Amino acid sequence: MSQLKGRAFYWRTLPRSNDGFPRRARDLAHEFALPERSRCAFLQSRPRRLGCGALLWRQTIAHGPSERMTLDEIRSLTEGDLSAVDGVIRARLKSAVPLVDQVAEHIIAGGGKRLRPLLVLLTARACGYQGNAHVEAAAFIEFIHTATLLHDDVVDGSSLRRGRHTANRVFGNPASVLVGDFVYSRAFQMMAALSSQPVMEIMSEATNVIAEGEVLQLMNAHDPHTTEQRYLEVIYRKTAKLFEAGAEVAAVLSGATPRVRQELAAYGRHIGTAYQLVDDVLDYRSNPQERGKNLGDDLAEGKPTLPLIHALRHGDEQQRVIIREAIQRGGVTQLEPVLTAIEATGGLEYAARLAREHAARAKAALAALPESRCRDGLAALAAFSVEHTT
């Protein structure tokens, strides 16, 4: 990777409007529909340069006129709910079958940001919920996410996640698939225990959509003709749908009105889309040690993500040939010229801009909620979705 040093993807210093929002000349036609002087202003931070030309966003957001909220500060708004979720996760992963316990311990030790449970907890509290069912809901949302990761790593042949060997690398593909099934079914046991038909309807539909997304991604693999629309359909189904479902479940448990429920579902959908768009940018511009994944993993798996799709659409003939062949063959032997083509065509910048637009829409949806610290936390998560670096 030493050859990649010096190829840092620079963002110009962004001039700001009177409202404090960053502007760039090339983006003046893409003004965001943000509420004027919103209480939690959407902040675009200047990146910092790390090794391998990392494209990074600081994990802070504007809170009020002068404060900034870190991710840990966002977590603190749940007042112990996240700790309760961790306890539920550990308890519900217990099994009389030793191998299940071993894989479960490997999963727990792997950690994670717990963004989806955090979204559920904050949404419920922002809606005024006073019970405890949101803790179970946050846990089963995380279980669905965990099950999909276990299966994804098998399908993709991944060996590294969060800087550690994947479960399939340690225990083998059969064990990883079967324990994924266990985690998935345990999630539905927990849903059933809530005795809420609307929750079951939301989650059964969501898991079906997620499964379809996995198949669509499989169909797109090694296909250089994948369009932006097809790509966005995949990330909605694979990633954004679970965020959407988590926010909607929290609204249902809180007894929110249909309008609020709809707005919160939109919030989850947009924040999930933004998060995945940035994740796909980071695949080409990140610090592998910090992120816990190899640079160019998507390219190695032949996944035509948005930076590649944009470069194919706007590159010259030589660049298009290089990218088409790289997608078709997979692997990272062409990573260097692919990076050059992506940077020359603004592919990373384009994907990041689209992510910011979705984050802005997520934040706008929060207008349906009354002002509160937890609503501020949800706005902070919208900013984090485009600022995360791992």
State what each model feature region is.
Residues Q3, R23, E36-Q44, L50-T390:
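All-alpha prenyltransferase/terpene-synthase fold signal
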Residues S2, A29-H30:
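N-terminal amphipathic/hydrophobic targeting modules at extreme N-termini
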